[in-house]
């Protein structure tokens, strides 16, 4: 009886166990290249209790965002003020932000254009170090950004964890790749001369990001553009400006100059079309709809001069093909995860399933049962799917 009453956790901790030396810990998954982002086990009561408290304390008051382009309070009062509410509870006000006007957009473009050469001449290692510092700061601020992901973007707890981790991974990945790929390379000289190859930033890059990944995609676009030596104008989704602003503040804290990285929240006609049409903008990065990508493409094509690169990640018709060799339980779990995580609002979400006739009825019946078990509700509640 005494042995049965012993605490199994204490017994496990007392064992002289050791991990296999050739199996890296999750943190060291990428070896010497870079650190992996820190995961959180939401099924662990201790971790969950600590995280819940930190999240509760991360937003102590209403967040108010003011464009850094203007310092004149009188001018700020003339801008349109937008109220940000919790999508699960519209009575809960999270914060406020001001939309930029045409004058602010013009100032931002001019500022980014004027400092493009100075930023491009900053050593790539220094730019990469800034991204590493931002990654560390972002990881330390996980409770804040999880809180924003849930309250501003309506994400579930696990999705919020994944959102922060993906952003951290983007920062470290691009920092490492930039140092390895964008530094000075000495080429062979057939006659003994010194030939060197060095990549140079294009200039001003306009980044347009969506609401469904308000931190990860927003961060990834900006990180890639900045570390490559470009100045950035970033237009976040109007639904997730607070998240974008808090991330930009981390960039500034890490040493990125304010005129190198500028946030321009606003309407499409003011903060979108005017920037795309400006000939001083050298490239556009978009994650959004096919229609938006086509509209930007046509706008860029109408401009005089050299071809302007458009890097666009848009939607698609994602499919799954299931034959009789597949384990039905696993198929159903994969369908539910791919089709319904984030309420299906992902460019990678499953749209169509093709099932072999012989297993179709069984699979569909089990899928219907799994869907009936899904809980729709407040994303702040752990039981919500």
Question: Where would I find each of the regions flagged by the language model?
Answer:
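Extended, amphipathic, non-transmembrane alpha-helical segments
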Residues: 139-145, 367
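Terminal low-complexity tails and localization/encapsulation signals of metabolic enzymes
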Residues: 1-110, 114-117, 121-136, 162-165, ...
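Extended hydrophobic-aromatic, low-complexity segments
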Residues: 92-96, 105-108, 121-128, 146-148, ...
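Conserved small-residue-rich beta-alpha loop and adjacent elements
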Residues: 184-258, 315, 329
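ALDH superfamily catalytic-core signature
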Residues: 8, 250-255, 277, 283, ...
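Generic beta-strand/beta-sheet core signal
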Residues: 85-87, 148-152, 163, 174, ...
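A structured beta-alpha segment of the ubiquitous adenosine-cofactor-binding alpha/beta core
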Residues: 194-196, 262-285
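Residue-level signal for inorganic ion chemistry
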Residues: 91, 112, 127, 149, ...
């Amino acid at each position: 009886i005494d042995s049965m009453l012993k605490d199994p956790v204490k017994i496990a901790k007392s064992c002289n166990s050791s991990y296999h030396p050739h199996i890296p810990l999750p943190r060291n998954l990428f070896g010497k290249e870079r650190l992996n982002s820190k995961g959180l086990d939401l099924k662990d009561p201790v971790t969950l209790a600590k995280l819940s408290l930190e999240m509760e304390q991360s937003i102590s008051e209403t967040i108010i965002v003011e464009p850094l382009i203007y310092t004149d309070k009188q001018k700020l009062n003339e801008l349109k003020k937008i109220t940000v509410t919790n999508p699960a509870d519209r009575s809960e006000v999270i914060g406020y932000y001001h939309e930029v006007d045409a004058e602010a957009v013009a100032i931002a473009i001019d500022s980014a254009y004027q400092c493009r050469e100075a930023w491009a001449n900053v050593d790539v290692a220094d730019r990469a170090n800034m991204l590493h510092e931002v990654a560390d700061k972002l990881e330390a601020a996980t409770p804040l950004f999880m809180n924003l992901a849930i309250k501003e973007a309506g994400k579930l707890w696990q999705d919020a964890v994944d959102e922060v981790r993906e952003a951290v991974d983007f920062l470290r990945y691009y920092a490492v790749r930039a140092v390895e790929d964008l530094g000075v390379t000495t080429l062979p000289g057939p006659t003994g001369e010194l030939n060197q190859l060095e990549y140079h930033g294009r200039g001003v890059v306009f980044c347009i990001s969506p609401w469904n990944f308000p931190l990860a995609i927003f961060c990834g676009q900006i990180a890639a553009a900045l570390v490559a030596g470009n100045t950035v104008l970033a237009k976040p989704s109007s639904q997730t400006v607070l998240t974008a602003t808090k991330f930009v503040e981390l960039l500034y804290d890490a040493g990125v100059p304010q005129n190198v990285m500028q946030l321009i929240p606003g309407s499409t006609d003011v903060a979108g079309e005017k920037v795309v049409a400006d000939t001083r903008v050298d490239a556009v990065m978009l994650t959004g709809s096919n229609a938006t990508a086509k509209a930007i493409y046509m706008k860029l094509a109408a401009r005089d001069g050299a071809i302007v690169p458009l890097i666009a990640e848009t939607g698609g018709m994602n499919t799954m093909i299931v034959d009789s060799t597949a384990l039905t339980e696993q198929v159903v779990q994969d369908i539910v995860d791919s089709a319904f995580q984030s309420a299906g609002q992902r460019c990678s979400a499953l749209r169509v399933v093709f099932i072999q006739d012989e297993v179709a009825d069984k699979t569909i019946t089990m899928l219907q049962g799994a869907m009936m078990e899904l809980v729709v509700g407040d994303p702040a509640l752990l039981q919500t799917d």
